[in-house]
Regions:
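Polybasic (Lys/Arg-rich)
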Residues: 60-150
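Core beta-strand-centered patch of the WYL/Sm-like small regulatory domain
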Residues: 1-88, 148-150
Length: 150
């Protein structure tokens, strides 16, 4: 349903499917993503953000994760994927903000399961070390990702 919120936006994010705004949500007291097309009748408030609402305090935004993507192990011709993605060796090294890593992995169709179990055609890449997503809140969006068992 509809809710009213006061947010403190600081970044626009293109997920490849839609635009989001990254903002501090005063209602919940944390940083979140908001789909721009779902925001109705926005109003600009004449207020300065409080210190804890600034982007530098968003751990998921300031954290950079190093992702190592490799051709999916099920592929008979991994060299084609290496060529398609311009891999200089056996992997493609990417850096992403933790806040958007899940969106990126979803958009790129990266199998993030620990045992590369997603075998459908769209999954041409596999995340070589799914533990790199530990503590990344957006990892829930990454195809096949499973949080480590305690």
């Amino acid at each position: 349903g509809k809710t009213q919120r006061v947010i403190v936006p600081f970044a626009l994010v293109d997920t490849g499917l839609r635009w989001h705004v990254r903002a501090y949500d005063r209602k919940h007291g944390d940083f979140r993503d908001f789909v721009i097309s779902r925001i109705e009748a926005p109003k600009l408030l004449d207020e300065a953000p409080q210190a804890h609402e600034l982007a530098e305090n968003d751990i998921q935004w300031t954290r950079i994760v190093e992702l190592s993507l490799v051709p999916h192990p099920r592929l008979a011709r991994p060299e084609i994927v290496r060529m398609d993605y311009g891999m200089s060796g056996d992997s493609l090294q990417l850096r992403s903000r933790a806040a958007v890593a899940g969106y990126m992995l979803q958009r790129w169709g990266v199998d993030c399961s620990p045992d590369h179990r997603l075998t459908d055609e769209p999954y041409r890449l596999w995340l070589a070390d799914p533990l790199t997503l530990y503590g990344v809140e957006s990892a829930a969006l990454a195809p096949g990702y499973q949080p480590p068992q305690a």
